[in-house]
């Protein structure tokens, strides 16, 4: 039996609160069960040096966890003097995912940075970050239109992500921490809202997985992502 008696294909309760802070152009608190992530999108004029003069914009991301987001306190990475490999991998994943949702040429020479700060972690922090960051990005782009910086939003599609895995031989969707830590196979799937995939990260933690299990996990992810897209679009109506 899963925590909270969830079915194998069921995502956790999703709450997306927009305009959570007042300064950022886009600000979202996203909650997947007990995982809570604050996603703030900042718009700045100019682009990184490697894009100067090319007439296109850039979307990037940073990711971090508050010291007491987990059961025991973890020192801030700034106090250690460097980011961990895990942090760098996650923020690159978030950034790649968001760039797939935006027409960078239509964005023009602006940079949008989405900061994803994990307030509370209970599994799926990177996937929750992507799903919440997309909504914050939409709000930031819409604000650029309202302020006259853009004629229309360069958003091409919504993007969301979910974790899936095999626990005790059973494929499950949207893993909580206790499930994730016991998973024989762990996978993160990023998708745009027409069903096409941006990224699939799959690792056999305890035992190799078969082609049939891979297809089952991807099918679970697709079903879960449809629910997440619904939650995103419902939040954007409010």
Curated annotation (Swiss-Prot):
PROSITE patterns: RIBONUCLEASE_PH. The keyword Transferase applies. Its EC number is 2.7.7.56. CDD domains: RNase_PH_bact. Keywords: Nucleotidyltransferase, RNA-binding, rRNA processing, Transferase, tRNA processing, tRNA-binding. Pfam families: RNase_PH, RNase_PH_C. HAMAP family: RNase_PH. Homohexameric ring arranged as a trimer of dimers. Phosphorolytic 3'-5' exoribonuclease that plays an important role in tRNA 3'-end maturation. Removes nucleotide residues following the 3'-CCA terminus of tRNAs; can also add nucleotides to the ends of RNA molecules by using nucleoside diphosphates as substrates, but this may not be physiologically important. Probably plays a role in initiation of 16S rRNA degradation (leading to ribosome degradation) during starvation. This is Ribonuclease PH. It comes from Proteus mirabilis (strain HI4320).
């Amino acid at each position: 039996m899963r925590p909270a008696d969830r079915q194998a294909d069921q995502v956790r309760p999703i709450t997306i609160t927009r305009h959570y802070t007042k300064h950022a152009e886009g600000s979202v608190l996203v909650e997947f069960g007990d995982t809570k992530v604050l996603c703030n999108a900042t718009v700045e004029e100019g682009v990184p040096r490697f894009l100067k003069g090319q007439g296109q914009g850039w979307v990037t991301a940073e990711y971090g966890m508050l010291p007491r987001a987990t059961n025991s306190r973890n020192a801030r990475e700034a106090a250690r003097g460097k980011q961990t490999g895990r942090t760098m991998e996650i923020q690159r994943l978030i950034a790649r995912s968001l760039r797939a949702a935006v027409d960078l040429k239509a964005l023009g020479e602006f940079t949008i940075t989405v900061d994803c700060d994990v307030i509370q972690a209970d599994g799926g922090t990177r996937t929750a970050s992507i799903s919440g960051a997309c909504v914050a990005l939409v709000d930031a782009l819409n604000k650029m239109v309202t302020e006259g910086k853009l004629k229309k939003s360069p958003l091409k599609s919504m993007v969301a992500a979910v974790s899936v895995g095999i626990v005790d031989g059973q494929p499950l969707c949207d893993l909580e921490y206790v499930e994730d830590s016991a998973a024989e196979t762990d996978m993160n799937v990023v998708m745009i809202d027409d069903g096409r995939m941006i990224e699939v990260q799959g690792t056999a933690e305890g035992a190799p997985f078969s082609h049939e299990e891979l297809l089952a996990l991807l099918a679970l992810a697709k079903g879960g992502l449809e629910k997440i897209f619904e939650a995103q679009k419902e939040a954007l109506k409010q």
